Amino acid sequence: MNGQANVHLCVSQPRLWDAENPELYRCSAYLYKDGEQLDQSEDLFGFRTIKWNVKGFYVNGKETLLRGACVHHDNGVLGACSFEDAEERRVRLLKKAGFNSIRSAHNPASKALLDACDRLGMYVMDEFCDNWLVHKNPYDYAEQEFCQWWEQDLTAMIKKNHNHPSVIMNSIGNEISELAIPEGQELCRKMAVLARELDPDKAVTLGVNMMLCSMAAKGGGIYGEKKDGKENKNGSQTMDNLPTSAFFNFLMNKMGGIIEGAAAKPAADKATEVAISYLDIAGYNYAASRYEMDGKLHPDRVIVGSETLPKNLYKNWQLVKTFPYVIGDYMWTGWDYLGESGLGTVRYKSFKKPGEDAPIISGGCGVIDICGKLRPETQWNRLVWELTDIPGIGVEPLTHAGEIGSVSMWRDTDAVASWSWEGYEGKKTKVTVYASGAIVELLVNGKSYGKKKTKEYKAVYPKVTYVPGVITAISYDSVGKEISRTSMTTAEGRTRIHLTPEKHALRPNSQDLCYVNIDLVGGNGVTKSTEDVPITVVVSGAGSLQALGSAKPNMGECFFTNTHTTYYGKALAVIRAGNLSGKINVKASAPGLEDQFVELEVLG
């Protein structure tokens, strides 16, 4: 025996796996010698089929539109750590927000993440890397490292995915500008061939940035091409002098919609046609402007919006529904992340004041923040995807009343789902109502601010006076019949700390986590958005405090101390089990507030 055995099993009429019904089977293997069991291994897997063509993307024969979220590899306050519980929580909340697919931008997904996607039902576009021959940042994977390791690393990624029914696409790269030149095109061909040889079941794709490729074809570029950056005294370039991906994002913000326009030019098509011909599904980054025309120019091409702006979801989704060869849309991003600091952060002049001038550490562009809180835009997404008819309300923070924020391409609002702004009575703010009805009405304590027609499932009320009480949004159809309504209430009474653990039992494996949501609430249990204080968390017993933080972009505080200031009345503590059974006692305290306690149990 050479250490490998192949066994063929037949499962009659298997229950098929998909994102709505994630049916899994368990395979157990045992190793014996002379009748004695030496070892055993178990793995979960699922049965499903996928097929794609210009008529659509099919899972188990059913056409499936991909409601996608680009997701980076970090886990917010935990940093770049992957825990089973962290990944399961992320997938669970992404599903709650309406997503049915994630793109692991721009690194291969961890086993823990894929296991969670298998269990909970989430399609995955697993992405290999962010660069091939051209550097985007100092000390990245490009050039020598890539050339030496890409075959081994790509092989490892694809073999890792073999038993995961959640993985439907293997992406071999992101925004590779050298696709415009023969060297990059040949690499694309080789990588696509290898990916298909290793796993012919899954589609091969790549996130193509048409504008970057068009520039590279003309001898220019954003990143490390020879004509970029500054030369040193010897006439050569160093990575410290070259533009980085942060520079590209800054440029995109300044250019606004120009990138979509550049993508629509004939030069962009010419620069990318060869490389895209090697892909099963063409990933378009910020190129929805090409969807309709490429159905005519390239009638055999299947397209996915591999990276898009969240604010463009309505327009993009209409195109997805209209053109069957466009199989889905992946917004940047579904979940906020550490790095690319301030990419989507709405900036105010008050950020320069003492105490508010700390560096921004998060991207700020996720429709779910780094602590896992769903922002108001997620309700808009669900309305666009026709998953609900309940309206949503987004209130521009009254803590910045009178200030004009500098918005980003990636996030054009920092609205909060709150009508609790103590100390700002009488101040005016902008309120956005998200609704699928033709008409909406906004009321504060029964006083109507009028009915408005919706545009792209939104209606904006620019000057709403804050008065404590109840704010209500009502969605009507075109003849004035009420479809649905939603309300938010002001916090009342004395402030207290409220702790909400997401589970109470952990295993003694030193890996299990419990997320404890911390809110400053009034007597009616509603969060107070203006009463931010430093919260101290002390953990004793059979566990420890792994992280404590908030979603504030410019916090100036560490996630790994036991004190952190709330943001809009919220913070998040992550408790980690030890390797012994017992009780975990969690105490939260803040100046002037009564201590609060919660007890968890480690069972084993």
Task: Outline where the language-model segments fall.
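Substrate-binding clefts and catalytic carboxylate motifs of secreted carbohydrate-active enzymes
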Residues: 170, 193-197, 204-511, 523-527
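Secreted/periplasmic carbohydrate-active enzymes, especially glycoside hydrolases
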Residues: 1-111, 116, 120-121, 168-169, ...
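Flexible glycine/proline-rich, aromatic-decorated loop/lid segments
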Residues: 125-127, 132, 345-353, 489, ...
